[in-house]
């Protein structure tokens, strides 16, 4: 996606004219400008420069009296299902964007692109060409909160590599697995290790002191702490605070944090600009609930142990472009640094648990993008990459069959039903389309029921998307407190004959399941099987814990089914002999 199309050019424009205008705006390019009649092409060194050129020039810069129009150059054969939407209002909520995109078809993927502009950019994949064509026609120029959206095709790599016999993900032309695709059983797994950075928010007036003359101070911090430090000076121009990302070991991050905090305190004292400079840590919203703990216990313990005062920014401050919460720590420098260590320890634990849950999902849900689910906006540095392979994943041929339909019952607060349904049923319809699942809300069991049952029917990917959105909606609409994690009760039905396998000898399997997933798993005793000879398994926990437990139980059921089929096959062979 580094090749650019430059349109709306005068016939007299030459390569030298374009070279000059690119140089004036300090936009890097590679190779020569290929100028045609009224348009031109050029390559950029990487995707970052391509996006910067689009943001800098398109519709903003004139050349010989005509405004340049720049977008990604996409060959016709690659104009399929992928588009890029630019100039999205930064304060827009994911739900509003999803609602808009869903009007034109089924969104398979929605990833946010990192840019230096104040507005947001997303790459969207629809399920077919016609939906994509409609989205471009309707959305290009569409006014959204006083911002005119700009939409263009981007290359569809799957089309470029050929249809692959209708396979999804799959193998390249030389038979090698592409990234994110399932691999043959027994193939060595290479899990890319990604460390979560420490993200600090510092007052803009202290950024210069942190960097130092000609970068000397920040180089010294980097050298002493063996870390990589990014100061995001260009983002949010004019903002009172700037973000700093520290990439290192936990110890290196903490050492860098202490040095930065000491510099800010000294600068505040020397300039007499502030009596107190609190430590501000940025953490992705998905980790904050576990940092706070049940009834705020985890956070209170950190405060008591470190003798600090800790506050967390409101959920209302979250936007499409800002999925992070601000954790403000007040106290002595040493105490603030101790608090940072405890806070980041909790955040890293939550991150590692989520990575484990996603790795478990990956062979069942190939290619699933969490930004599309609305759980991890893709711009977040906390988002782990999709694993390139999973140990013990089934051979690719097993995915040629249609995924098995699953039925799950999720219990939500009764007062939340209206929020899930939406005005005139719009939200539940959009959710159903988005997840490609059947979603129905059962009538209350009694007039004063405090919970309602949501019945979701669909394959594993649909379950993941639909349940994820329901958890997110309940938190977003404040049905759970700001210091409370969303934990729901979920029921799945299993054959009565397989219930013993879920429990295990002396409860061993169910205990292991609870330890592994952090969910509460209960198989009620003395159940009467229903008309399909099935019994209920109850799962209680936060989203990832619940998902992990569901998948592990489905794995157990699949093994039972496989053994049963194998036994029947052996009996049939014995009879034939």
UniProtKB/Swiss-Prot annotation:
Modification Phosphothreonine occurs at: 528
Main location: nucleus
Listed InterPro entries: IGF2BP1_RRM1 (IPR034837), IGF2BP1_RRM2 (IPR034842), KH_dom (IPR004087), KH_dom_type_1 (IPR004088), KH_dom_type_1_sf (IPR036612), Nucleotide-bd_a/b_plait_sf (IPR012677), RBD_domain_sf (IPR035979), RRM_dom (IPR000504)
GO biological process, one term: dendrite arborization
Domain KH residues, every copy: 195-260, 276-343, 405-470, 487-553
Subcellular location: Nucleus; Cytoplasm; Cytoplasm, Perinuclear region; Cytoplasm, P-body
Expression sites by tissue: Expressed in fetal development and neonatal life, but is undetectable in adult tissues (at protein level). Expressed in embryonic neurons, including in hippocampal (at protein level) and cortical neurons. Also expressed in transformed tissue cultured cell lines derived form adult tissues (at protein level).
Assembly, per entry: Can form homodimers and heterodimers with IGF2BP1 and IGF2BP3. Component of the coding region determinant (CRD)-mediated complex, composed of DHX9, HNRNPU, IGF2BP1, SYNCRIP and YBX1. Identification in a mRNP complex, at least composed of DHX9, DDX3X, ELAVL1, HNRNPU, IGF2BP1, ILF3, PABPC1, PCBP2, PTBP2, STAU1, STAU2, SYNCRIP and YBX1. Associates with mRNP complex. Interacts with FMR1. Component of a multisubunit autoregulatory ribonucleoprotein complex (ARC), at least composed of IGF2BP1, PABPC1 and CSDE1.
Recorded domain comment: Domains KH3 and KH4 are the major RNA-binding modules, although KH1 and KH2 may also contribute. KH1 and KH2, and possibly KH3 and KH4, promote the formation of higher ordered protein-RNA complexes, which may be essential for IGF2BP1 cytoplasmic retention. KH domains are required for RNA-dependent homo- and heterooligomerization and for localization to stress granules. KH3 and KH4 mediate association with the cytoskeleton. Two nuclear export signals (NES) have been identified in KH2 and KH4 domains, respectively. Only KH2 NES is XPO1-dependent.
Descriptive protein name: Insulin-like growth factor 2 mRNA-binding protein 1
Source species: Rattus norvegicus (Rat)
Gene assigned in the entry: Igf2bp1
